[in-house]
Amino acid sequence: MLIQLDHVKKEYEDFTLELDMHIPENRVIGLIGANGAGKSTTFKLMLGLIRPDAGDVKVFGKKAGELSAEDRQKLGTVFSDSGFSEYLTVQQVGRIMQEFYPDFEPEQFYRRCEYFHIPQKKKIKEFSTGMKAKLKILLAVSHDSHLLILDVK
């Protein structure tokens, strides 16, 4: 299994998430639900960004909170409320990605940016909302990710 959530429970003051989910490799899965249903919480559990109050979360056969740096480099993530500093250009972001991800493919990334009309020398703060979303997705798929998690609104 690529992802396993077994008897997982996460409690907040006004919300409790309980779930079991097994996702095999080579699948495309969508989580659909109302705002506040627990989709983002589920993704954060999968990524080891938060710990469950009960149950086990495994990714690549390992506990999510114990993924190595090498394992984490296999993850491509897009969260609507995250990203690089808006004072950077796409070229600067590309150089940063090369430093952090050995499998980052800059030529492919820049080619895709051109295809989707993402200006490489303009600061991200000058981008439209749609251009920022495209950039996040292009970054997530430009480093040979084995698991892609998109949490967009």
Residue ranges of model-derived segments:
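Helix-to-loop junction immediately C-terminal to a conserved catalytic motif
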Residues: L47
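Catalytic Walker B motif of ABC-type/P-loop ATPase nucleotide-binding domains
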Residues: L148-V152
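The feature captures the beta-strand-to-loop junction immediately N-terminal to the Walker
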Residues: I32-A34
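ABC-family P-loop ATPase nucleotide-binding domains
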Residues: F79-K136
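Conserved ABC transporter NBD signature motif
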Residues: G55-E66, E70-D71
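A short, flexible loop at the N-terminus of ABC-type nucleotide-binding domains that lies
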Residues: M1-D20, E25-R27, S68
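Conserved signature/switch motifs of ABC ATPase nucleotide-binding domains
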Residues: A133, S142-H143
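ABC nucleotide-binding domain signature
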Residues: G30, Q73-S80
